């Protein structure tokens, strides 16, 4: 783990509550609004920020996040600007962990070594790259770890006992458990199944296990947070941004505040959840 990530999860464990991990697309609907949203997240209760890297072919994303990526790209967002977004955020917040989430193609085009150096300079703590399996660890995972950036893996309900050790081998920071198969924005999973999955994963790792896909309300966050070390919310935040926009897709007067209000409610859910020790 990076020091920021390690410190944050240790503090949350001491408090006895799960992390609220909030995702939004960098540059949606524009750079300045996106930075305003990012700055508002910690004050509203976000413990970790997942910053989406826009990509033209996001195969694992549902319609809401696909549209967010399209809005960001249309507004001129690039990977370089996404790193700058993190750097600008770091000018006023040196404590909140930032995880970049997206696909390998933009990183490959940028240049792996240059990307990692720029990510470190921007204050990035971790990466989630959804289309790089463990068999391709030499591409980005190993170089990232060597430079001190966490590489966070996704586990799913179909990740069986035989596959799980390979998935977890070079994972650091936390494990992201995708609580159901399919694309982002799916329905809420069965909390009892999530609890069993978290326990199963923890038999193989001491890393925190954060659960995402389908969490949209404070009650959802409370239910999932009862057994997970963290609750990941993405589509609900992206939808909140989308509904706040003007008819021509520009930021509304209340876009930042609308996101902050939603996150404040989600934080109430995670803060009322009681962590169950996964043994």
Swiss-Prot record:
- Which residue positions are annotated as catalytic? 50 (proton acceptor), 61 (proton acceptor)
The residues forming a coiled coil are none
In the UniProt record, the signal sequence range is none
Its UniProt pathway annotation is:
Amino-acid biosynthesis; L-tryptophan biosynthesis; L-tryptophan from chorismate: step 5/5
Q: Which domain of life is it from?
A: Bacteria
Q: Name one Pfam family in it.
A: Trp_syntA
The record's annotation in InterPro entries points to:
Aldolase_TIM, RibuloseP-bd_barrel, Trp_synthase_alpha_AS, Trp_synthase_suA
The catalytic activity, as recorded, is: (1S,2R)-1-C-(indol-3-yl)glycerol 3-phosphate + L-serine = D-glyceraldehyde 3-phosphate + L-tryptophan + H2O
What does the record give as EC number?
A: 4.2.1.20
- Describe the subunit structure: Tetramer of two alpha and two beta chains.
The family this protein is said to belong to: Belongs to the TrpA family.
Protein name per UniProt: Tryptophan synthase alpha chain
Q: Which organism is it from?
A: Rhizobium rhizogenes (strain K84 / ATCC BAA-868)
Ranked from the top, the taxonomy reads: Bacteria, Pseudomonadati, Pseudomonadota, Alphaproteobacteria, Hyphomicrobiales
Q: What gene does the UniProt entry assign to this protein?
A: trpA
């Amino acid at each position: 783990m990076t020091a920021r990530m390690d410190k944050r999860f240790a503090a949350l464990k001491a408090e006895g509550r799960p992390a609220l991990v909030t995702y939004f697309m960098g540059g949606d609907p524009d750079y300045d609004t996106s930075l305003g949203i990012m700055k508002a997240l910690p004050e509203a209760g976000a413990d970790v920020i997942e910053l989406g890297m826009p990509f033209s072919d996001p195969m694992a994303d549902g319609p809401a996040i696909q549209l967010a990526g399209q809005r960001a790209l249309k507004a001129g967002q690039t990977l370089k600007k996404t790193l700058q977004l993190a750097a600008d955020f770091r000018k006023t917040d040196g404590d909140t962990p930032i995880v970049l989430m997206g696909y390998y193609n933009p990183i490959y085009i940028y240049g792996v070594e240059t990307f990692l150096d720029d990510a470190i300079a921007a204050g990035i703590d971790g990466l989630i790259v959804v289309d790089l399996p463990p068999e391709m660890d030499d591409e980005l995972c190993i170089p990232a770890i060597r430079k001190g950036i966490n590489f966070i893996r996704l586990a799913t309900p179909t990740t069986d006992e035989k596959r799980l050790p390979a998935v977890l081998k070079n994972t650091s920071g936390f494990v992201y458990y995708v609580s159901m198969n399919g694309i982002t924005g799916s329905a809420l999973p069965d909390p009892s199944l999530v609890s069993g999955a978290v326990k199963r994963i923890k038999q193989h790792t001491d890393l925190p296990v954060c659960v995402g896909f389908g969490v949209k309300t404070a009650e959802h966050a409370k239910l999932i947070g009862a057994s997970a070390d963290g609750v990941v919310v993405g589509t609900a935040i992206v939808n909140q941004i989308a509904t706040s926009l003007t008819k021509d897709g520009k930021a509304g007067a209340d876009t930042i505040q609308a996101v902050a209000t939603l996150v404040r409610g989600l934080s109430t859910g995670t803060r009322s959840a009681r962590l169950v020790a996964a043994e």
